[in-house]
């Protein structure tokens, strides 16, 4: 079992129960899933780019990504409905906790000029979204085999009802918010 999950059960639940004075342990917010998304708009010209992006995502997440397709045609972007234009992965359970641990302790500190993540990127319901500009911050990605530096979107979905509860949950895991 992931260390972060054990830490959540042993310390975070008690800490948040006291902070927000919950009456039941089931009221304490928890992380439901982490969604990784990589948009590869250039894939309309070169299918190899999407394959490389999907393999990078599989290495980062430890799970095969789902190829996302365009929902509708947009002439300005030269895409048609159904064209493959990206990939996404939804992590739950053990893989989710492993990924979160690697994100907090290894990947984010490797970002150049890192001062913390934006604390205002909550959606109003306690879910947090952030973007990563380079996939090479993850140690699993071999820098020499990368054909193109791509970014990805990371969304952490929680059961928290408010942004304040969501921020307290992530802060309890020592999530590096900007001061």
Swiss-Prot record:
PANTHER family, per database record: 60S RIBOSOMAL PROTEIN L11-RELATED
Molecular function in Gene Ontology: RNA binding; rRNA binding; structural constituent of ribosome; tRNA binding
GO CC annotations on file: cytosolic large ribosomal subunit
Role: This is one of the proteins that bind and probably mediate the attachment of the 5S RNA into the large ribosomal subunit, where it forms part of the central protuberance. In the 70S ribosome it contacts protein S13 of the 30S subunit (bridge B1b), connecting the 2 subunits; this bridge is implicated in subunit movement. Contacts the P site tRNA; the 5S rRNA and some of its associated proteins might help stabilize positioning of ribosome-bound tRNAs.
UniProtKB keywords: Ribonucleoprotein, Ribosomal protein, RNA-binding, rRNA-binding, tRNA-binding
Keyword Ribonucleoprotein tagged: yes
Pfam families noted in UniProt: Ribosomal_L5, Ribosomal_L5_C
GO process terms (BP): translation
Protein name per its UniProtKB record: Large ribosomal subunit protein uL5
Matching SUPFAM superfamilies: RL5-like
NCBIfam families named in the record: PRK00010.1
Subunit and partners: Part of the 50S ribosomal subunit; part of the 5S rRNA/L5/L18/L25 subcomplex. Contacts the 5S rRNA and the P site tRNA. Forms a bridge to the 30S subunit in the 70S ribosome.
Stated family: Belongs to the universal ribosomal protein uL5 family.
């Amino acid at each position: 079992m992931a260390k972060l999950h054990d830490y959540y059960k042993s310390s975070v639940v008690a800490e948040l129960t006291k902070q927000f004075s919950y009456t039941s342990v089931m009221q304490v917010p928890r992380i439901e899933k982490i969604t990784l998304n990589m948009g590869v708009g250039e894939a309309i010209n070169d299918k190899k780019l999407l394959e490389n992006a999907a393999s990078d995502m599989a290495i980062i997440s430890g799970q095969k990504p789902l190829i996302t397709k365009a929902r509708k045609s947009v002439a300005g972007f030269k895409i048609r409905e159904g064209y493959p234009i990206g990939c996404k992965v939804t992590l739950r359970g053990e893989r989710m906790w492993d990924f979160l641990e690697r994100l907090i302790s290894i990947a984010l500190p490797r970002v150049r000029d890192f001062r913390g993540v934006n604390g205002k990127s909550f959606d109003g319901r306690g879910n947090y979204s952030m973007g990563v500009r380079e996939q090479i911050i993850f140690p699993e990605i071999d820098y020499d085999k990368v054909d193109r530096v791509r970014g990805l979107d990371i969304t952490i979905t929680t059961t928290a009802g408010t942004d304040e509860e969501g921020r307290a949950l992530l802060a309890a895991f020592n999530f590096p918010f900007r001061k």
